[in-house]
């Protein structure tokens, strides 16, 4: 009697031993002899059902393959690029003459590839917040390529985002970090100076190593330095260039040149750390040390939001206030020269009326008790109605305050005179300034006798003209 032994990975039983072996003999398995053993099927007892099913499947496959147009439904190629890929790789015998134009791609220019193929097919919304596509593309590409191993390519470690004040550079960076799931290691300009020489440079290395440790543990991270140039740059003759400024610039240069070999004082080892992309923001990188911002170390990105970007950001600012989209567009177009931060301040200014009403209702003396030492907690205001007319009114008020700051130079007039200069010029022009002093405003001055003891005393006179008469 022959025994049936199951083989590794086989679903059928082993064939019977017909060579006169004993009943206790076992058949060697393919798992024992290795994967190179050929498995022989028993052809003496063919299975009619198995053969029939295999024949049917083969017939079905042949029937499916007969459709010569089936590949068109899955064809994602582009004719222009297919022609260019084949250029120089196909024998000229199978191509038309050189001047026929059949193997010349019509739209093979760099502009076609960069504009037609490089589309921002990324979700640039984080909740209700708008992320500028160009801004997100720059940060995502910079962070991604710093984690890739690109052969024979020197990738700048630092990305410098610079531009005008209040344009949302830091906030846009934070939105991109949140979109990527990155919790960056944060630094600010205030940490780049210290009473102890060398402390800021050491702190930069520590923060960089912290980010590298997070990356080594499998969590994406980056180093984010906010407002670099106030802490490491020269802001004219009003600031002093210290040893810490020099060491901060030198440390960033060294890290950019050796991103995987950042050592801490007292911890010198040859084990490479993870590469950490660095993103810095600022308003004017010309104040920084020139070798730091060269192309091999820092990639510069000038951020100037377009009209579409400004409308997108402002739509997120006023979304909770249910301001219609067409009103947001009109508001942005009404103040074209203002920064994005201007519209955030404009929204906050609308709440002044609500706060003023609450202060009048509780009394000025009870404000501290209601806000700090109250069981009920601070008051909760209902969202005021933000109409386009109200927003335009408060926006013009903010613009007038900006013009006052630019026009009035009180520091120059502080010692020369006691007048306010042109501080009230806009109010005077509008007729809303009531304290019209004669020495500040060019108004006609009433002349007459200003002596109360005189016979012809004129109480309305503001300047004595010498016409006083007296009773002797």
From Swiss-Prot:
UniProt keywords, alphabetically: ATP-binding, Chloroplast, Nucleotide-binding, Plastid, Transit peptide
Positions with a binding annotation for ATP: 163-170
Pfam family of the protein (one): RuBisCO_activase_AAA_helical
Transit peptide: 1-58
InterPro entries tied to this protein: ATPase_AAA_core, P-loop_NTPase, RCA-like, RuBisCO_activase_AAA_helical
Compartments where located: Plastid, Chloroplast stroma
Compositionally biased intervals (Basic and acidic residues): 452-465
Gene Ontology molecular function, alphabetical: ATP binding; ATP hydrolysis activity; ribulose-1,5-bisphosphate carboxylase/oxygenase activator activity
GO CC terms: chloroplast stroma; thylakoid
Function of the protein: Activation of RuBisCO (ribulose-1,5-bisphosphate carboxylase/oxygenase; EC 4.1.1.39) involves the ATP-dependent carboxylation of the epsilon-amino group of lysine leading to a carbamate structure.
Protein name, as recorded: Ribulose bisphosphate carboxylase/oxygenase activase, chloroplastic
